[in-house]
Amino acid sequence: MALLLCFVLLCGVADFTSSLSITTPEQRIEKAKGETAYLPCKFTLEPEDQGPLDIEWLISPSDNQKVDQVIILYSGDKIYDNYYPDLKGRVHFTSNDVKSGDASINVTNLQLSDIGTYQCKVKKAPGVANRKFLLTVLVKPSGTRCFVDGSGEIGNDFKLKCEPKEGSLPLQYEWQKLSDSQKMPTPWLAEMTSPVISVKNASSEYSGTYSCTVQNRVGSDQCMLRLDVVPPSNRAGTIAGAVIGTLLALVLIGAILFCCHKKRREEKYEKEVHHDIREDVPPPKSRTSTARSYIGSNHSSLGSMSPSNMEGYSKTQYNQVPSEDFERAPQSPTLAPAKVAAPNLSRMGAVPVMIPAQSKDGSIV
């Protein structure tokens, strides 16, 4: 009887306290960067909930250094979504009529800064309810690169590497062979799920096309690799070629330097010759003195000739100088030189010259 009474009392309390409630359970949500996160929040009202309906979403950032901040609010039949600058324009109610019992929101174009705890709070007096959701934003693997680290020659040791440019941990790797038998070499089986495969004592059987797939909880990426295991190269020939090439380069450089040096020396010599001061050449003899010498020599010749020898000799104009010896430009008239007395001429070093006189008939006096 006592147990039955207690059950009736508990039922009465439950009925009395039943009011607004959120039916969506708390949960953890993981989404990739750039995607849209759906945060559900559905509620039910009771007849006794007669107050105005207020819906409020808050965020607690993951760094735990900031207090809870409102990101979107519904109150008085109006929506306010300009509270949180980091989510401005990226948070919206999913329902056009939140009074119908759906206060869910979408957060678009997710960023790493959106990671945190989101709380949905619904109030309609006297009912109050809230739910929390943990949002985690992950980065999909992308920009994955496959490559050979080392020399892919027979007998060598090298590594096959698979490296994504970005991607949230944890990451899972899977290697596959796409060509020939499509079977991974037996020594590699232990590392098929590793980002690095260590190849020991490589053989030509390892040649082929391989793929590496990287994935995490929000996405995956893949890269391809073509492996060609070739015979060892002729290293002696390579070294000899490198040495010969180096010597030829040195010879060429030496020839260029020699030519440049020679050209500079020639230019320097030309400059020195161009600026060298030379002794002036003595001026040509005076035409007047030449003419006088010519006249004097003629007179001397005439003086030594007898009258009989002069009969066939044409009369020479002594007062004229042959034009072929003296062709000069006309000069401005000059004053006649002043006469100098004979004693003064002797002091000046003049030598007297005897000029034979000539009569009217041409005979020498």
Swiss-Prot record:
Glycans are attached at N106. GO terms for molecular function: beta-catenin binding; cell adhesion molecule binding; connexin binding; integrin binding; PDZ domain binding; signaling receptor binding. It comes from the Eukaryota. GO terms for biological process: actin cytoskeleton organization; AV node cell to bundle of His cell communication; AV node cell-bundle of His cell adhesion involved in cell communication; cardiac muscle cell development; cardiac muscle cell proliferation; cell-cell adhesion; cell-cell junction organization; defense response to virus. The modification Phosphoserine is found at S297, S304, S306, S323, S332, S363. The keyword Cell membrane applies. This is Coxsackievirus and adenovirus receptor homolog. N-glycosylated. Palmitoylated on Cys-259 and/or Cys-260; required for proper localization to the plasma membrane. Disulfide bonds join C41-C120, C146-C223, C162-C212.
